[in-house]
Amino acid sequence: MVAMAAGPSGCLVPAFGLRLLLATVLQAVSAFGAEFSSEACRELGFSSNLLCSSCDLLGQFNLLQLDPDCRGCCQEEAQFETKKLYAGAILEVCGUKLGRFPQVQAFVRSDKPKLFRGLQIKYVRGSDPVLKLLDDNGNIAEELSILKWNTDSVEEFLSEKLERI
């Protein structure tokens, strides 16, 4: 059985064609320097903490066709980063998976989150630990996987990025 979906002309086309169309559109958008949303990057198979230096390595593995998507999803390494405070942050975790990340669990269940203005703990089913930094309008400015961070790293990072109470 082949999955079918309505195409642009109303005709039924294989769902694979829609994925190909989506990939083509995303490549066209990336050619104009636009960044993809974190959801689109995950759909394309890229991590939320992908560094642009990783995209430079694609040629070594004959994967240059992935370069435009990689560039649309990557984050530049901060060479001369100025200290920027964000308006808030959301630490997303799955309550049922939290035990697999004892360091993040220790941070979430401690009093430390109360020390940071604008920090919210959000339980999202199935989510690995992710930290979303918010701009002044409440939009996601940065998204980082904190999968392997320890309690001190989370606290230190938040001390640099959020205002302490």
Curated annotation (Swiss-Prot):
One GO MF term attached to the UniProt entry: oxidoreductase activity
Signal peptide region: 1-31
GO biological process: 'de novo' post-translational protein folding; sperm DNA condensation
GO cellular component, one term: endoplasmic reticulum lumen
Protein localization: Endoplasmic reticulum lumen
InterPro entries reported for this sequence: Sep15/SelM_sf, Sep15_SelM, Sep15_SelM_dom, Thioredoxin-like_sf
This protein's UniProt keywords: Endoplasmic reticulum, Selenocysteine, Signal
Description of post-translational modifications: The N-terminus is blocked.
Main location: endoplasmic reticulum
Keyword Endoplasmic reticulum: yes
Disulfide bond positions: none
Tissue-level expression: Higher levels in prostate and thyroid gland.
Residue intervals passing through the bilayer: none
Oligomer status and interactors: Forms a tight complex with UGGT1/UGCGL1. Interacts with UGGT2/UGCGL2. Interacts with RDH11.
Entry similarity comment: Belongs to the selenoprotein M/F family.
Protein task: May be involved in redox reactions associated with the formation of disulfide bonds. May contribute to the quality control of protein folding in the endoplasmic reticulum. May regulate protein folding by enhancing the catalytic activity of UGGT1/UGCGL1 and UGGT2/UGCGL2.
Name the record gives this protein: Selenoprotein F
Gene: SELENOF
